[in-house]
């Protein structure tokens, strides 16, 4: 059985969002980015995950507007509240304050005193909301005794830390289940050579590492880099220097590990999420969507046979459609069950 401690990095101020709302609380499909990540982490404990997890807890490292973040995730206040809190209701949440933002290595180190050496640590980013439980499960299963990291190959890798592998980059495989070549280090963009900057495989920020080793590596970090920060990624090279090898899994869909730093990236993630939801409804439930690109699901939708949804329909909360339901264009439907053979005309607002 696996004892898993998840560390979620949620301390970033997010200045590029130009917002009074903490970055990690900006919504994707009506749900804060942080909540999406917590839902994915909590799902690892379910029977459907395939992981034999004996114990799971989540450590949220917060900094900027910490009380606002805690209140929203705890479900104790206002506009960002929602039924999604039930996703992690039975998982211990532990809040860790990072008073100064001194880098990702420093952020993770704040949480480690509350994690036993025998645990496996899964590190997630609160501004990477599309990560799926299935990918996290594969990452955990593929980890060597020294750990694993999640990577992605990008045509334009500017701004990301480049992954250095044994034997170079010529044998990169894109199939997440088949990538097993070992990693020697990660070099951040600002510290990379010109040759390293040409590499296309980058670090997603998601890692799975043994707690005891992680504590040892973090104690040896320094700030000898352009940013003057403690880089969590330096642990990869430290492991390699000790003769330990980390595996790396390369995801096939870059959107799954897309980070959000500004409103344009938030909009990209929103559309990617909606496309994923629409495809699932069409393939798994047989829903007909007049235009999958003009449909928004901000909650859950269950449909019967032969249902049709026209363009620019917004579904909020928990909605069920009986058999043969037809929804006209420009409708909003919230927390509603619609009986079989019903027809909803254009511009209806149903709550």
Which sequence ranges carry the predicted segments?
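Short aromatic/basic micro-patch
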Residues: 27, 130, 208, 259-260
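A structural signal for short hydrophobic beta-strand segments in well-ordered beta-sheet cores
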Residues: 25, 163-166, 248
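Conserved catalytic-core motifs of eukaryotic protein kinase domains, centered on the activation segment
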Residues: 17-21
């Amino acid at each position: 059985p696996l004892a898993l401690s998840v560390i979620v990095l949620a301390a970033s101020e997010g200045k590029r969002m130009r917002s009074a709302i903490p970055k990690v609380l900006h919504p994707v499909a009506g749900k804060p980015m942080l909540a999406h990540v917590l839902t994915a982490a909590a799902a690892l404990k379910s029977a459907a995950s395939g992981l034999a997890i004996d114990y799971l807890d989540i450590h949220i490292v917060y900094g900027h507007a910490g009380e606002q973040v805690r209140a929203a995730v705890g479900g104790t206040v206002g506009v960002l509240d929602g039924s999604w809190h039930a996703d992690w209701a039975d998982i211990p949440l532990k809040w860790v304050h990072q008073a100064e933002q001194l880098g990702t290595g420093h952020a993770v180190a704040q949480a480690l005193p509350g994690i036993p050496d025998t645990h496996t640590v899964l590190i997630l980013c609160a501004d990477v909301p599309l990560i799926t439980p299935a990918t996290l499960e594969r990452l955990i299963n593929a980890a060597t005794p020294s750990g694993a990291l999640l990577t992605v190959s990008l045509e334009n890798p500017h701004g990301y830390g480049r992954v250095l592998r044994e034997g170079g980059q010529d044998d990169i495989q894109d199939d997440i289940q088949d990538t097993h070549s070992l990693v020697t280090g990660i070099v951040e963009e600002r510290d990379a050579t010109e040759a390293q900057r040409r590499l296309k495989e980058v670090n997603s920020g998601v890692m799975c590492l043994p707690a005891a080793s992680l504590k040892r590596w973090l104690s040896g970090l320094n700030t000898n880099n352009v940013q003057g920060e403690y880089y969590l990624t330096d642990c990869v090279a430290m492991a390699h220097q000790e003769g330990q090898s980390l595996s790396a899994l390369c995801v096939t869909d870059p959107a799954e590990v897309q980070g959000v730093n500004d409103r344009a990236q938030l909009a990209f993630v929103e559309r990617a999420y909606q496309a994923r939801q629409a495809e699932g409804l069409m393939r798994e439930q047989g829903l007909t969507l007049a235009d999958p690109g003009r449909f928004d699901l901000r909650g859950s939708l269950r449909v019967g046979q032969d249902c049709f949804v026209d363009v620019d329909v917004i579904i909020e909360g928990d909605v069920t459609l009986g058999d043969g339901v037809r929804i006209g264009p420009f409708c909003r439907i919230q927390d509603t069950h619609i009986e079989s053979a019903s027809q909803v005309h254009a511009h209806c607002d149903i709550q």
